[in-house]
């Protein structure tokens, strides 16, 4: 057995365990998944019903990753008549086959729903460590339907799933909600995806937030959570993601961990973070201003937003998402003026 555990700024835990293609269980052949955990969790908030179903090989072979499988589920289970803010819409949290392993970017996840912004397929990608924790809890996809009678949150922990009262959290912003969930559940390493007042009040552009650090920011999936009276999903797991050839996989990971920081684009991203993109987008006439009514401004009007012009001055330390070699996120502190001493995360862009 080969087991490798990484711990870092995002409490990284990727475990690689070799196993056979099939295993005998009670005299019957049972599929041994690699990459996938093999389970879809379903929650019907109207009925208070929780079910688990096996992930099918047909889905994994015919549709690409978490995004593709989620698109298929939404296509099959909703239609043109489905109200994006109605109980029949689906909220789908999805991971891919390498989520929760050691390769860069494997903490990411996809949120899928029929979008309240335009009534069509809505998908948003989030970072941090939430996606990896979904896998560690034993799931590839979480499909939520229905509407709870009162605010609730889901608590997933190593095979156990609870629908808990969230009335005391309703009205709280996302940062406070995450903090209160960690205190209530007694574990500072819990990962959560939650909404704030915008999602609760069904603003069609509302987005959920995870762990005060990552935002699946497109297509209004936060409003879909609010329409279901779902304040948050809290997760803690300790399971492992299996790969077929751990030695070869670790070799690939090591190669990328060495190469990626040396690429000019990624080196700049590491040093100043996503505000670096403002300069590039402005030159490309791709900088959305005033709700995209304008796409470019004179450099003297926007240069103070360029990452290289403010991040070095205020940066305290760097931190990264799960299993990432590019700590593009920065903690900053204001040194002077009326807000001197204030600190937090620097603005993201992109």
Regions found by a protein language model. Name each.
Residues 7-13:
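Short, low-complexity, charge-dense intrinsically disordered segments
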Residues 8, 20, 345-346:
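Intrinsic low-complexity/disordered segments
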Residues 14-29:
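Short, Lys/Arg-enriched N-terminal segments with co-localized hydrophobic residues
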Residues 29-125, 129-350:
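Intrinsically disordered, low-complexity segments enriched in small residues
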């Amino acid at each position: 057995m080969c087991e490798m555990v990484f711990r870092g700024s995002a409490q990284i835990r990727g475990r690689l365990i070799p196993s056979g293609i099939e295993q005998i269980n009670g005299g019957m052949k049972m599929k041994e998944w690699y990459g996938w955990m093999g389970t879809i969790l379903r929650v019907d908030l109207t009925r208070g019903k929780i079910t688990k179903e096996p992930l099918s090989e047909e889905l994994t072979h015919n549709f690409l990753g978490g995004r593709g499988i989620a698109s298929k589920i939404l296509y099959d289970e909703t239609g043109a008549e489905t109200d994006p803010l109605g109980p029949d819409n689906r909220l789908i949290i999805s991971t891919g086959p390498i989520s929760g392993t050691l390769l860069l970017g494997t903490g990411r996840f996809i949120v899928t729903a029929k979008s309240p912004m335009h009534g069509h397929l809505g998908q948003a990608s989030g970072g941090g460590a939430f996606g990896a924790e979904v896998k560690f809890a034993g799931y590839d996809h979480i499909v939520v339907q229905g509407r709870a009678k009162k605010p609730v949150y889901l608590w997933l922990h190593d095979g156990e799933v609870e629908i808990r009262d969230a009335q005391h959290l309703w009205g709280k912003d996302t940062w406070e909600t995450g903090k209160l969930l960690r205190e209530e559940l007694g574990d500072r390493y819990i990962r959560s995806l939650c909404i704030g007042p915008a999602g609760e009040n069904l603003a069609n552009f509302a987005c959920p937030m995870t762990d005060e650090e990552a935002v699946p920011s497109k297509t209004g999936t936060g409003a879909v959570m609010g329409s279901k009276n779902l304040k948050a999903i809290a997760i803690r797991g300790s399971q492992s993601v299996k790969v077929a050839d751990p030695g070869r996989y670790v070799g690939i990971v090591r190669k990328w961990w060495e190469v990626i920081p040396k690429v000019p684009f990624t080196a700049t991203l590491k040093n100043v973070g996503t505000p670096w993109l403002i300069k590039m987008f402005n030159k490309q006439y791709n900088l959305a201003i005033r709700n995209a009514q304008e796409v470019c401004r004179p450099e003297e009007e926007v240069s103070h937003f360029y990452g290289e012009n403010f991040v070095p001055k205020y940066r305290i330390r760097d931190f990264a998402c799960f299993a990432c070699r590019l700590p593009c996120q920065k903690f900053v502190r204001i040194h002077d003026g009326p807000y001197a001493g204030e600190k937090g995360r620097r603005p993201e862009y992109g």
